[in-house]
Amino acid sequence: MPIQVLPPQLANQIAAGEVVERPASVVKELVENSLDAGATRVDIDIERGGAKLIRIRDNGCGIKKEELALALARHATSKIASLDDLEAIISLGFRGEALASISSVSRLTLTSRTAEQAEAWQAYAEGRDMDVTVKPAAHPVGTTLEVLDLFYNTPARRKFMRTEKTEFNHIDEIIRRIALARFDVTLNLSHNGKLVRQYRAVAKDGQKERRLGAICGTPFLEQALAIEWQHGDLTLRGWVADPNHTTTALTEIQYCYVNGRMMRDRLINHAIRQACEDKLGADQQPAFVLYLEIDPHQVDVNVHPAKHEVRFHQSRLVHDFIYQGVLSVLQQQTETTLPLEEIAPAPRHVPENRIAAGRNHFAVPAEPTAAREPATPRYSGGASGGNGGRQSAGGWPHAQPGYQKQQGEVYRALLQTPATSPAPEPVAPALDGHSQSFGRVLTIVGGDCALLEHAGTIQLLSLPVAERWLRQAQLTPGQSPVCAQPLLIPLRLKVSADEKAALQKAQSLLGELGIEFQSDAQHVTIRAVPLPLRQQNLQILIPELIGYLAQQTTFATVNIAQWIARNVQSEHPQWSMAQAISLLADVERLCPQLVKAPPGGLLQPVDLHSAMNALKHE
């Protein structure tokens, strides 16, 4: 058979094999087009499970007469015009294949009118070349799409359709997912002339709660814990069911959205499951409705033809962010269940970084952050921290008391708490009793030094050196080994016989440092690393560590921890005041001996008296 160009209808039918799996796929594509058109009301009429009729009617902006023929053409879209648009998609649709594919396997009619037009127009495509016919019609502002006799010309596809009830259940599930994504849109679903679902547009929190209960059920609503979590360009909000009360019926409720787009993403599910694993049985699954907002440039939605999957450019960061967000709300729930005498109001608290920060111009938190630090935090996002989430008290129901006030502070503490902490820290003493302090940070000099004032003296502190001592303290085992953080993607490296022998000899010591691995004939697989190494380039650091071990004759955890601390890359090429204050607070807490006896290269006194005297003699 010679090479030839496929007829338009056959090409569209091939594309339909990826986009149009069943009637529910048609409903999803068409309703998403309505939402992209700015519709606030969408009516979905179904007959015989979608096999006979699918009608989608909206009050969106409509389509101009001269664009109707293009709307049914393949690769025609109003969503993108360049590669830059594709790399920052904010609309639900963008491929320009849905209408052409659907019209090739059904009898599709498109009727639309814009606000500028006095009349509506109707378009439909037919024949081998998919020629489009346009004629006048009566229709209000908006668009109606009718899909008749789905798969009428592809009998093999029609045979794979299930029963009418099964196909409608899939459509119902699609509408439920869309209703959870867009609280501001009214959705009406009818089947065989009967109204089955009606989700009215809502704006207030209580109304959103009622829609959540109508879709997910009262049991989920009763156990739902609100999440509002933010760090940088990442925002996580929504609800997760209390794992302690999760039933089999609730485990089917797993809805996740990325920038408003419904997703089935294994990375997100893994992060949520990992956060709940301590409270879920082996046969249980978490129940959640979560919304992840991320910079569109940091996520690729052009992965799957049906747009069910995405690819994150920084998958490890997204995974750990979601894990920490879910874990934090579960820990908040645990704290609220303590006896009343344990949660009585605490005296005014002075956080550990108050001396370094200077005078506090904002409200003091009602409870000590140290009392909220988990024993084994797993998120590593750098020392910057401090990016509290937006307050959810006015946006989402079931917000935990006091959560919004302390969110930014708790998040900073989570980012910085060492993995060796065996128990929550006691409440910090009053400011006057805090003798272990470098002093107050005045400014940053040269990008990597902090100018400090303490007891009337001025000193210059090297922030990279202080960070190295902090990393060494975090990596040095205390009464228990350093907590190992499992890698989402294990690192597999080829090693020599000498390197393998050195690793096996030091395996127990590396385990105390939180580094876990498995070895075979010629390779070693790194499966876990301690918290300070999560954001390091392990493909460079681990081979260098293996080379260092191969050159040693004896091993000690202190020496290995010291080597790692000296060779990890700093996360701050240019330090800010907030980062310096956070670093010093952690160094003062974990390395108090540095305050009493600073090692060489850490502190350098600045002789202000000589400088002042020199100025006086001028």
From Swiss-Prot:
BP terms from Gene Ontology: mismatch repair
UniProt keyword annotations, A-Z: DNA damage, DNA repair
Gene Ontology CC, one term: mismatch repair complex
Entry-linked InterPro entries: DNA_mismatch_repair_CS, DNA_mismatch_repair_MutL, DNA_mismatch_S5_2-like, HATPase_C_sf, MutL/Mlh/PMS, MutL/Mlh/Pms-like, MutL_C, MutL_C_dimsub
SMART domains membership: DNA_mis_repair (SM01340), MutL_C (SM00853)
GO molecular function ontology, one term from the record: ATP-dependent DNA damage sensor activity
Keyword set includes DNA repair: yes
Cited SUPFAM superfamilies: ATPase domain of HSP90 chaperone/DNA topoisomerase II/histidine kinase, DNA mismatch repair protein MutL, Ribosomal protein S5 domain 2-like
UniProt signal peptide: none
Ranges of biased composition (kind: Gly residues): 382-392
One Pfam entry name: DNA_mis_repair
Matches recorded under CDD domains: HATPase_MutL-MLH-PMS-like (cd16926), MutL_Trans_MutL (cd03482)
Record flagged with keyword DNA repair: yes
Classification via HAMAP family: DNA_mis_repair
PANTHER family according to UniProt: DNA MISMATCH REPAIR PROTEIN MLH, PMS, MUTL, DNA MISMATCH REPAIR PROTEIN MLH1
Protein name: DNA mismatch repair protein MutL
